[in-house]
Regions:
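Structural signature of FAD isoalloxazine-binding scaffolds in flavoprotein oxidoreductases
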Residues: 63
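Short, charged beta-turn/beta-strand-edge "cap" motif at the junction between a beta-strand
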Residues: 66-71
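A basic, amphipathic helix-loop patch mediating RNA/tRNA/ribosome contacts
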Residues: 12-55
């Protein structure tokens, strides 16, 4: 299992799920990120997530297959 973190910029309160997948190079494009999310492959805080623009905040945990990403401030 691969564990990773994403640190929010001091001026940001959140990052959208789709943007996180692109920044972490899990998805090659916005369209690819959308498909990953719509297919139900992403969990946020233990719940299956289908909202591509889900706002991720510090303390949230995103899981996709063998990848776990912790959001920090």
């Amino acid at each position: 299992m691969q564990k990773d973190t994403f640190k929010l910029r001091p001026t940001d309160e959140f990052i959208e799920l789709m943007k996180l997948l692109k920044l972490k190079q899990i998805a090659q494009s916005g369209g690819h990120a959308k498909l990953i999310i719509e297919d139900g492959l992403v969990n946020v805080n233990g719940q299956q997530e289908f909202r591509k623009r889900k706002k991720l905040r510090a303390g949230d945990i995103v899981k996709l297959e063998e990848i776990t990403i912790s959001i920090t401030k």
